[in-house]
């Protein structure tokens, strides 16, 4: 019976991921990445209008807030990233499910630096395809191997934040232990993540002698972020050890900054983010600088949580800013 229950939990998690991905590809947004829905009168309205109002986010000066946005490639054409060899590797098995590394291989005469990419999804949905284009772009254009990591999600059997963080560290360890066959330099790597993935990427970067961290709309102080500290979601509460303050502090990147060899940080956020406060990125940037590290903070006024996605007109700007930052620091 336990085996069947575990299988059922895994199927539910996979279905949630599939539904979330589908919704993400069909959701209307304006160019600020705010979600739109039809208003029944031939126009549009903000899906979360009441939430913006409650958060006192003034829309009065945004004349284009109800105009749908559709991404059209400008600088980022498919020829820049298509054709990269990708291999899927099972790096870990746990509680009846497999965890996968999707490795986008750089073509290089010498062992390549590599990036670890961690997807968002509130620690409970989505998959490791979210950074595929950036990973393959850097593999093809910059000789940087990309490692897109799947990790234990909150609905899966035995899931806790500590288990998920261990997955991240085990993924890194797997790549380093197999550096020769993957043709990578085990000492030259960085982390990138979005939202919950930015939290995990930051933990991984601070604990591992990483060269750099790129975080989009990330959670870095879990004792202050509303998505954790004020959550009413029973599954998330259990995942975070019943919101035990010691646990939240122990897994907060702002408390994990090393005394030396601090990873260079590029932190991106939008001031109208309803999911994660932009202040989270500001706090980590300040903390890194106070310890003598490098932190580049890119704040986008009026932009919502998914400003780094194709639902935002800043997607390509953030994409190439990230690519340049990664190439500069992975030396």
Segments from the language model and where they lie:
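N-terminal cap/lid segment of alpha/beta-hydrolase-fold proteins
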Residues: 54-109
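Catalytic nucleophile-loop/oxyanion-hole region of alpha/beta-hydrolase
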Residues: 127-135, 145-186, 310-317
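Short beta-strand/loop motif that positions the catalytic acidic residue
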Residues: 260, 266-269, 273
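C-terminal catalytic histidine-bearing segment of alpha/beta-hydrolase fold enzymes
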Residues: 282-285, 289-331
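Primarily recognizes the serine-hydrolase "nucleophile elbow" in alpha/beta-hydrolase
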Residues: 170-229
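Mobile cap/lid helix-loop segments that gate and shape the active-site cleft of serine hydrolases
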Residues: 78, 219, 223-256
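Conserved alpha/beta-hydrolase "acid-adjacent" motif
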Residues: 274-280
């Amino acid at each position: 019976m336990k085996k069947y229950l575990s299988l059922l939990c895994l199927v539910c998690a996979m279905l949630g991921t599939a539904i979330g991905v589908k919704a993400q590809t069909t959701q209307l947004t304006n160019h600020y990445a705010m979600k739109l829905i039809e208003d029944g009168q031939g126009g549009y309205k903000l899906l979360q209008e009441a939430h913006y109002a409650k958060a006192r986010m003034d829309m009065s000066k945004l004349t284009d807030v109800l105009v749908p946005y559709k991404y059209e490639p400008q600088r980022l054409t498919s020829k820049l990233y298509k054709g990269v060899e990708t291999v899927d590797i099972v790096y870990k098995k746990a509680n009846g499910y497999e965890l996968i590394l999707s490795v986008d291989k750089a073509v290089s005469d010498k062992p390549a630096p590599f990036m670890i990419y961690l997807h968002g999804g509130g620690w409970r949905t989505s998959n490791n395809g979210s950074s595929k284009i950036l990973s393959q772009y850097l593999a093809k254009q910059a000789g940087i191997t990309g490692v897109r990591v799947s990790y234990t999600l909150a609905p899966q059997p035995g899931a806790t934040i500590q288990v998920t963080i261990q997955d991240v560290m085990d993924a890194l360890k797997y790549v380093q232990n197999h550096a020769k066959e993957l043709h990578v330099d085990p000492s030259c790597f960085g982390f990138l993540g979005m939202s919950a993935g930015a939290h995990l990427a930051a933990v991984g970067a601070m604990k591992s002698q990483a060269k750099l961290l790129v975080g989009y709309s990330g959670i870095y102080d879990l004792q202050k972020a509303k998505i954790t500290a004020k959550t009413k979601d029973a599954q998330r509460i259990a995942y975070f050890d019943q919101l035990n303050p010691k646990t939240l502090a122990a897994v907060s990147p702002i408390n994990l900054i090393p005394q030396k060899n601090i990873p260079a940080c590029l932190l991106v956020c939008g001031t109208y983010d309803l999911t994660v406060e932009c202040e989270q990125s500001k706090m980590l940037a300040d903390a890194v600088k106070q310890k003598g590290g490098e932190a580049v903070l890119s704040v986008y006024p009026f932009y919502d949580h998914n400003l780094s996605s194709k639902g935002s007109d800043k997607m390509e700007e953030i994409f190439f800013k990230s690519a340049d930052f990664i190439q500069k620091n992975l030396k």
